Amino acid sequence: MNRRQTWSLLLIAFGLFYLVPLSNHGLWIPDETRYAQISQAMLLGGDWVSPHFLGLRYFEKPVAGYWMIALGQAVFGENLFGVRIASVVATALSVLLAYLLARRLWRDPRTSLACALLYASFGLIAGQSGYANLDPQFTFWVNLSLVALWYALDAGSRRARLLGWTLLGLACGMGFLTKGFLAWLLPVLVALPYMLWQRRWRELLGYGALAVLVALLVCLPWALAVHAREADYWRFFFWHEHIRRFAGEDAQHSRPWWFYLPLLAVACLPWSGLLPSALRQAWHERHQPPVAFLALWLLLPLAFFSLSRGKLPTYIMPCLLPLALLMGHALVQRLRQADSLALRGNGLLNLGLALLALAALAYLQLRKPVYQEEPFELFLVLLVIGAWAAAGLAQWRYPLRAWAAPLLASWVLIALLPAAMPNQVVQNKTPDLFVAEHLDELTGARHLLSNDLGAASALAWRLRRGDVTLYDTRGELKYGLSYPEHSQRSVPLADIRQWLWRARQDGSVAVLLRINSASDRYQLALLPGDGERYRNGNLVLAVLPQVRP
C-alpha cells in the first residue's frame, strides 16, 4: 500500500469511527449538557465575554472552549454533531501534531505514522474525542505549545526560531482562555529543566519573553473585558478553580497521590502491553535530546497532577502525546529488529481483557441482567468484545504483520459502545433524548423546573432557553445563585407548593425530575396530582396546567 492509499484509508476510518457516531447518542450529563447549554446561550444571547450557565454566572472556566463549541453549533446546527465537533477537531489536530513532532524528532515516515496511530487509538484520547468537554481542546493547546517549543529549539534559522516561540505564546494564550493558568505552567515545567540541561538558559530568557508577550496579547483583551463586566471573576476563578482544587482540604474529586499511575496504563489501552519495553528503551536513550524532552514532557506534568488533591482521569491527557511518541519509537525499533515479544504480550493482554469482559457480561446477564429485551444493544456490545478479542488474537499470532490490529479494537469501541449502552444507562445519563420526545408538550410551558443540574441543562438546551428554576438543588451553581438578583432561581423543598401555585397562575409549568433516591421520590410526591405525567426509567416529566388565581 503506497502513502496516498494509506492516508486515504485513514481519512475514511476517521469519518467512519470518529464523525459518524457523534449523532448516534444523547448528551451525557453533567458535562456535555452543561457545555452545550453555556455555548448555546452565548450563541443566542450574544454575550461572548461572561459565561452563564442556566442564566447564572458560571466562572469555573474561561471562554475559549465555549466559543469553539458555540462555533460548532453555529456551523452545524444546535444538535449533537454540532456540540461535539469541536472535540473531534481538537483531537484530530493533536494527532497531526504527534505525526509532525515524530517526523521532526526522528525523520522517519514509518515512525511518524506509528506514533500518530498509537496516539489516535489510545483509549482515553479516542474516547474523549466524541465527548463535548474542554479537555480535548485544552490538550491540543498544550500539545501545540510544546511542539512549538521543540520546533523553536531545533530551528535552523533565527526566523524559524522566532516563529516557534511566537506559536508557543499563541498556544499558551489560547490554552489559558480555555482552562486557565495550567496552560502557562505546563510548558514552563518542561522548558525550564530541559533548557538548563542543554545550557540554553539565555535563549529561554530572551525568546521566552517573546512567548510571554504573545500570550499576554492573546489573553488581555478578554481578561480586561471580563474584569470590567464581572469584577469578582478573577477572585473566584483563581482561588476556587486553582488554589482550592490543587491544595484545598475540601478539593473536588480528591484522590490519592498514586491515582494516575495505574490510570496511565489504562489510558494507553489497547497498547498498554508496550509500556514496559517503551519505558525501558527511553531509559537507555535518556541522554538523547529528543527522548529527554519527551520524558520531561511526560513525567513532570504527571508529577504535578499527582501532587494535586483534586484529580480526574482526563487531567493527564496532556501527558499522553509524549508517551505515544516514546511507544511508537520503541514499536518501530522492535519491528525492524523482528523482536515480537512486546507485541505478542500486548496481543495476549488484549485477548485476555476481551475474554474477561465476555465472562463478566455473561455473569451479569445470568445473575442480574444488564440488557433486558435489548437484543440489538447486546449484539453491539458483543461485537465490540469480539473485535477486541480478534485484534488481540491477530497481534498475538502474527505480531510483526498484524502489529496495528489494536487500532481496530479501539476504533470499533468508540464507534459502537455509546450505541450499545443498556437502556437503564441511557435513560439515566442522557435526559436530552427524553426531553426531545416531549418537545410538543414542553414548548408552551411558561415555567420550567428541575431537581438536577444535568436534567435542567438538557431541558434548557433542547428548548433553547436557560430560565430553568432549580428545585431543592444548587450544586456548582451555588456561586451564581448567591447574587441577590438570582435568589429566586432556586426553590427550597419547603416552598415548592407555594412557588408552584404562584407560577401556575402565570401559565403552565413543566417539571423534569431525576429520581435516584428517597429524597427525590419525596420531591416528586410534593407535586400536584393533576396534569400530564411521562416517565422513562428514572426520569419523570410532569406538565402542570395553568390555574386561575
From Swiss-Prot:
- Organism of this sequence: Pseudomonas paraeruginosa (strain DSM 24068 / PA7)
A GO biological process this protein is involved in? protein O-linked glycosylation
Listed pathway(s): Lipopolysaccharide metabolism; 4-amino-4-deoxy-beta-L-arabinose-lipid A biosynthesis
Keyword Transferase assigned to the entry: answer is: yes
Could you identify this protein by its name?
Answer: Undecaprenyl phosphate-alpha-4-amino-4-deoxy-L-arabinose arabinosyl transferase
Indicate how the chain sits in the lipid bilayer.
Multi-pass membrane protein
- According to the record, the segments passing through the membrane are 9-29, 80-100, 112-132, 136-156, 176-196, 204-224, 256-276, 288-308, 312-332, 346-366, 376-396, 402-422
Q: Which InterPro entries match?
A: ArnT_tfrase, Glyco_trans_39/83, LipidA_mod_glycosyltrf_83
What does UniProt give as GO cellular component? Answer: plasma membrane
NCBIfam families attached to this UniProt entry: PRK13279.1
